[in-house]
Amino acid sequence: MDAWRGMPRWGLLLLLWGSCTFGLPTETTTFKRISLKRMPSIRESLKERGVDMARLGPERMALVNITSSVILTNYMDTQYYGEIGIGTPPQTFKVVFDTGSSNVWVPSSKCSRLYTACVYHKLFDASDSSSYKHNGTELTLRYSTGTVSGFLSQDVITVGGITVTQTFGEVTEMPALPFMLAEFDGVVGMGFSEQAIGKVTPLFDNIISQGLLKEDVFSFYYNRDSENSQSLGGQIVLGGSDPQHYEGNFHYINLIRTGLWQIPMKGVSVGSSTLLCEDGCLALVDTGASYISGSTSSIEKLMEALGAKKRLFDYVVKCNEGPTLPDISFHLGGKEYTLTSADYVFQESYSSKKLCTLAIHAMDIPPPTGPTWALGATFIRKFYTEFDRGNNRIGFALAR
């Protein structure tokens, strides 16, 4: 989803399949499984094409020192996408499901071909939908990697076999970088109404209002072994969680406040020593982000402890040193959630140098949301995550 409407943190991205369903709640409509697909991130696509990100310039690819008071999302590293249908008959779009933002948007057929990103993506054509209703209110969404703008429209959206009437953004202006290389078309915000631009009711709120779910929760599973493009990248469950993908019971942490998927954190340990956040800090849980991020000062201290070297936008170690790096533990709700080096180090197979990138970034988020850590797919792959709207809390269980 930055930032943090997450890090567009993102991700992170899901594949939603299903037919339209209406009616009163039943056993078949209270629990919806949604398959996820994994893709190369925009950053990976750039590197695979031999693009030197340093040459793009910090003004084009800035990922740090965000001055906005809202959470911004950086979709450079988003890896998971899903599908939704918009209109009648449904027009299908690949989207990021992002707990760091609250609006739904897709590219519009009214987007000028002068915007290269629109040429490479599926466009929503209102004239092809019999259920479309005009709104026209202007919409602008700022992300750390650029601004998208357009206007609001209303139509039916089908997600996970559930169909709701939804106000969403038709984007008519979107920057070539990073969106030209993105495999996803748009974004579905899974955040709260307090974050929604234009006072739009978020999609999940509309689903809740239909009374079709057993519980007012949704959960995320990201497959740690999904490098094969044909394998299941992960899963979202609307209305519950899937015991096939986690072990034991959930451990819940209450949100800092209603309106943001942010929880208190009591420390970050490297090995057996608590190195950071000794006096307490905050952590966003961001499905739109692929990496874990913290403030620049915190990440610099962490990287020094790991012996990692900084590149323009990331940190690297020699690959043969990766297995020897210490565990990193996050202290949440009285428990320690530990990542081994195998969880936060990955090798760039397309790099000629034997360097491995750490799935940890620096990100400075200003008040009132920040300073804050953000726990993205690096964390969620290890810990199955349940977002409980009914009780304003987040639950974690060991993924399997």
Curated annotation (Swiss-Prot):
Main location: secreted
CDD domains: renin_like
PROSITE patterns cross-referenced by the UniProt entry: ASP_PROTEASE, PEPTIDASE_A1
Disulfide bonds: 111-118, 277-281, 319-356
Annotated glycosylation sites: 65, 135
Subunit description: Interacts with ATP6AP2.
A Pfam family this chain is assigned to: A1_Propeptide
The protein, known as: Renin
Active site annotation, chain numbering: 98, 286
Keyword list, A-Z: Aspartyl protease, Disulfide bond, Glycoprotein, Hydrolase, Membrane, Protease, Secreted, Signal, Zymogen
EC number from the UniProt entry: 3.4.23.15
Locations listed in the record: Secreted; Membrane
Role description: Renin is a highly specific endopeptidase, whose only known function is to generate angiotensin I from angiotensinogen in the plasma, initiating a cascade of reactions that produce an elevation of blood pressure and increased sodium retention by the kidney.
Alphabetized PANTHER family for the sequence: BETA-SITE APP-CLEAVING ENZYME, ISOFORM A-RELATED, RENIN
GO biological process: angiotensin maturation; cell maturation; drinking behavior; hormone-mediated signaling pathway; male gonad development; mesonephros development; regulation of MAPK cascade; renin-angiotensin regulation of aldosterone production
Regulation acting on activity, per entry: Interaction with ATP6AP2 results in a 5-fold increased efficiency in angiotensinogen processing.
Similarity field: Belongs to the peptidase A1 family.
Coiled coil (residue ranges): none
GO MF term list: aspartic-type endopeptidase activity; signaling receptor binding
Propeptide residue intervals: 24-60
Protein's organism: Callithrix jacchus
Signal peptide: 1-23
GO cellular component term, pick one: extracellular space
